[in-house]
A protein has these predicted regions:
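Core segments of transmembrane alpha-helices
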Residues: 11-23, 77-96, 170-171
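Transmembrane alpha-helical segments that form the membrane-embedded catalytic/substrate-channel core
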Residues: 39-56, 109-128
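Helix-coil boundary and interhelical linker segments in multi-pass alpha-helical membrane proteins
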Residues: 19-37, 93-106
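Phosphate-binding glycine-rich loops and adjacent basic patches that engage nucleotide phosphates
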Residues: 23-30, 48-55, 78-88, 105-114, ...
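Membrane-helix interface/capping segments
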Residues: 49-70
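Cytosolic/stromal cytosol-facing helical appendages immediately following the last transmembrane segment
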Residues: 1-12, 65-79, 98-104, 111-184
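Short amphipathic alpha-helical segments
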Residues: 36-39, 61
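Metal-centered catalytic cores of metalloenzymes
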Residues: 1-31
Length: 184
């Protein structure tokens, strides 16, 4: 599949899938493992929403605006490694500091899976690769892609100014936007 061979996705996938395998092997066994995977997944969906809403449409707008001006540009499409690697290390260290080791491993499995899903959904929403046509037909994915399209466009007009009325900050879920009343 072509998407796997783009440089960013390939490196991201190798690094994070290796970590996910490690976390999965050394995490809890049984139902606690799946509970903490689920909680890690949910935590990442909130982090994704909150960082987009509070940071990228706030103090980091000038950096993020490049993506709104050229949404399909590979340079601005995925979270840059200069941001994601230090942030990932900080998050992993924070979980390790506050949670028992096995909990951290399980939690980070869910967190990592959610982050991979986020990167792929965001890539698919802007690139629409032909080999992913079957994914584009799944109702849940269609709803996510429509919501993200509304984040970038309103009435056919591209939203690229900080004062534009942005909505739909989540990528992999709609529920945080519904809770914060930013869903359209």
């Amino acid at each position: 599949m072509k998407i796997i061979f783009t440089p960013s996705i390939k490196l991201f996938s190798c690094v994070h899938i290796s970590a996910l395998i490690f976390f999965f092997i050394f995490g809890y066994e049984g139902y606690l493992h799946y509970l903490f995977i689920t909680l890690g997944y949910i935590a990442q969906t909130y982090f994704e929403f909150a960082s987009h809403y509070y940071l990228f449409h706030g103090p980091f707008w000038k950096f993020h605006q490049k993506h709104h001006v050229e949404p399909s540009n590979d340079t601005h499409l995925l979270v840059p490694f200069a941001y994601s690697i230090p942030l990932g290390i900080t998050i992993h260290t924070g979980y390790y500091y506050f949670l028992p080791l096995k909990t951290t491993f399980s939690f980070m499995t869910g967190h990592g899976l959610s982050y991979l899903f986020f990167e792929y959904i965001h890539y698919i929403s802007h690139k629409r690769p032909k080999h992913f046509v079957y994914i584009l037909k799944i109702p849940f994915v269609k709803a996510l892609l429509l919501a993200h399209k509304k984040h970038h466009y309103k009435n056919g007009k591209m939203l690229k100014d900080k004062n534009d009325n942005f909505k739909n900050y989540g990528f992999t879920t709609l529920y945080w936007d519904k809770i914060y009343d930013t869903y359209e």
